[in-house]
Amino acid sequence: MCSLPRGFEPQAPEDLAQRSLVELREMLKRQERLLRNEKFICKLPDKGKKIFDSFAKLKAAIAECEEVRRKSELFNPVSLDCKLRQKAIAEVDVGTDKAQNSDPILDTSSLVPGCSSVDNIKSSQTSQNQGLGRPTLEGDEETSEVEYTVNKGPASSNRDRVPPSSEASEHHPRHRVSSQAEDTSSSFDNLFIDRLQRITIADQGEQQSEENASTKNLTGLSSGTEKKPHYMEVLEMRAKNPVPQLRKFKTNVLPFRQNDSSSHCQKSGSPISSEERRRRDKQHLDDITAARLLPLHHMPTQLLSIEESLALQKQQKQNYEEMQAKLAAQKLAERLNIKMRSYNPEGESSGRYREVRDEDDDWSSDEF
């Protein structure tokens, strides 16, 4: 029975929830490596069923982790605001605990307006604003209203009656601190709702059009007050008084003359035939260059009738067949190895004898 190599065993389903995303991806790569080894899977008794199951579970776990991370990224700003609110509420609770654990002398003094309990609440609010790091005008107004209500409450109670025991003195700061915590939490909720309502979604084209309009207005205002730059003045002067362009130097071109141009303009006024223009162009080419076309060896193309074209084709075909016959005879003679030599039936001796005899005759004639 074959066993999986070390490190490639499929993980139990309960272990996948405790694994991180990096570990899950590493395990998925290992399972893919095992699935690619077809020979190894064929040797297994279950034909790799467990490996396929673990592969599917790993894929599902990775998809779930990615979905959770994506949702957490979407709700990240909301969670930050919630954490800040929880931190503020915790600071208020700490302030209440300190107020409860304080001495009865401080509790009785809290009944007088502007006492230490109210100061403690103010200090907790200031520390809370510093921890948030972004105080706003609305938050300051709400906190001032809360302080006003807290200060007003004990003053009215002092005018009506004074508590006879320390129980009443403990009851009032608790009530004030709890109302303070509720007011601060409601103020944070209102701030959060206001900020969400201020968020608007606008099209990119509208934003660009607004930016362009603002830039145009700014440029119009600035152009009315500022003077034109120097380079704009130079460009306007150059447009009014343009500089004549110089002709580029070209090879094999006669130098430009004003008289020639004027005479050419005068001549161009009169109509010129196509043959005259062609002759002038040819003469101009002969003047500026020494390269000329060679004379034609054959006559230019002509339009022929059908009968003449048929006769020319037949003649061309006959010439072609004759040429093919000559080539075939030459090749056949080369294959048969036929050699043409001079035929002499008397042989070389007869020729020599005749030559010698002729010489003797010449000698005899010379003797006489």
Swiss-Prot record:
Name the UniProt record assigns to this protein: DNA-directed RNA polymerase II subunit GRINL1A
Keywords in alphabetical order: Coiled coil, DNA-directed RNA polymerase, Nucleus, Phosphoprotein, Transcription
Biased composition (Polar residues): 116-131, 205-224, 258-273
Effect the entry attributes to changing R33D: Markedly reduces the interaction with Pol II
Coiled coil (UniProt feature): 301-335
Span list, region Interaction with Pol II: 227-298, 315-340
Bias kind Acidic residues: ranges: 358-368
Gene that encodes it: POLR2M
PTM notes: Dephosphorylated at Ser-270 by the PNUTS-PP1 complex, promoting RNA polymerase II transcription pause-release.
Region feature (Important for transcription repressor activity): 29-68, 299-314
Family annotation (InterPro entries): GRINL1 (IPR026213), Tuftelin_GRINL1A/MYZAP/CCD68 (IPR051375)
Classification lineage: Eukaryota, Metazoa, Chordata, Craniata, Vertebrata
UniProt modified residues of type Phosphoserine: S270
A UniProt-annotated Pfam family: GCOM2
Region called Disordered, residue ranges: 116-186, 203-227, 255-282, 339-368
UniProt record, GO biological process: maintenance of ER location; transcription elongation by RNA polymerase II
Tissue expression as described in the entry: Detected in adult an fetal brain. Detected in heart, kidney, skeletal muscle, small intestine, lung, prostate and testis.
Family: Belongs to the GRINL1 family.
One GO molecular-function entry: transcription elongation factor activity
Extra remark: The adjacent MYZAP and POLR2M genes are part of a complex transcription unit. The respective transcripts derive from different promoters and are alternatively spliced. In human, some transcripts of the upstream promoter of MYZAP use exons of the downstream POLR2M gene.
